Design a protein with these regions (language model features):
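Beta-strand-turn-beta hairpins that frame and shape the catalytic cleft
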Residues: 1-4, 114-124, 172-177, 205
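Active-site environment of divalent metal-dependent phosphoester hydrolases
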Residues: 10-15, 40-43, 65-70, 158-171, ...
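Acidic, His/Gly-rich catalytic cores of divalent-metal-dependent hydrolytic chemistry
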Residues: 170-249
Length: 249
């Protein structure tokens, strides 16, 4: 049994296509698990949804930005300029997916996915952390105690998350926690896409985090070509201008 676990595609089919090509180059998989943040803060949400739903076998759960697009909720941030940029971007995406006939599909995405691996191990896939699609997520600043609290009583041996755009492979007690990073909208300094491959059989399983390069200048050009309302806000990711809070001086 082979799985590819992706998250945070953010309306970027160029990055998604690069990851799908890498999966094929690794011999393909039996199923894709996609952990949300599919459409917002990107230039072509419809193509991303078409690509993903055309895969032979694929499961989805929602991310916080998928929920924002559908419900009108917004992130709890204090930077007023970022608030305005995000509001404009989410509104544009909402109109785009509504016109394309995907609004109801997006709104029906579940909070989590579960799978049983061949050796009996229990897999849980969520966007941010068990029980939530939002918040700080699984990030390098979490203490061992905080990490253990996240996985207490979750009925899983292997947990996959995204949300923070920062790949991590951690263990809390007997639970393996893998943050697959993001397909798009990367934090500096490593601007490549990331995802995870799972190899599972009757005797156990292994997880491999992979990095994939793609044409970021083509993404920048596509953002301009899409007449997105906040091009500068999006382009910053692909020029390496964004760093997470734990990397800022």
């Amino acid at each position: 049994m082979r799985l590819a676990v992706l998250s945070d595609i953010h309306g970027n089919p160029i990055a998604l296509d690069a990851v799908l090509a890498d999966v094929a180059g690794q011999g393909g998989v039996d199923e894709y698990l996609v952990l949300g943040d599919l459409v917002a803060l990107g230039y072509d949400p419809i193509t991303v949804l078409q690509r993903l739903t055309s895969l032979p076998k694929v499961g989805f759960n929602r991310g916080n930005t998928d929920r924002y697009v559908v419900t009108g909720d917004r992130p709890a941030i204090t930077d007023q300029e970022a608030v305005i940029e995000m509001a404009n971007s989410f509104s544009w995406t909402q109109g785009y997916v509504t016109a394309g006939g995907w609004f109801d599909w997006l709104g029906a995405l579940p909070l989590e996915q579960r799978r049983a691996l061949p050796d009996g191990s229990r897999l849980l896939a969520v966007h941010a952390a068990p029980g939530t699609d939002d918040g700080p997520g699984v990030n390098p600043e979490l203490s061992d105690t905080e990490l253990l609290q996240l996985v207490t009583d979750i009925d899983a041996d292997l947990v996959f998350v995204g949300h923070t755009h920062w790949p991590l492979d951690l263990t809390a007690g007997r639970v393996r926690i893998v943050n697959v990073g993001s397909v798009s909208n990367p934090w500096a300094p490593d601007l490549r896409a990331s995802y995870a491959l799972v190899e599972a059989g009757p005797s156990g399983w292994s997880v491999h985090l992979r990095r994939v390069d793609y044409d970021r200048q083509a993404v920048i050009n596509a953002i301009h070509g899409a007449h997105h309302p906040t091009p500068g806000f999006l382009i910053g990711w692909f020029r390496g201008e964004r760093r997470p809070s734990w990397q800022r001086g």
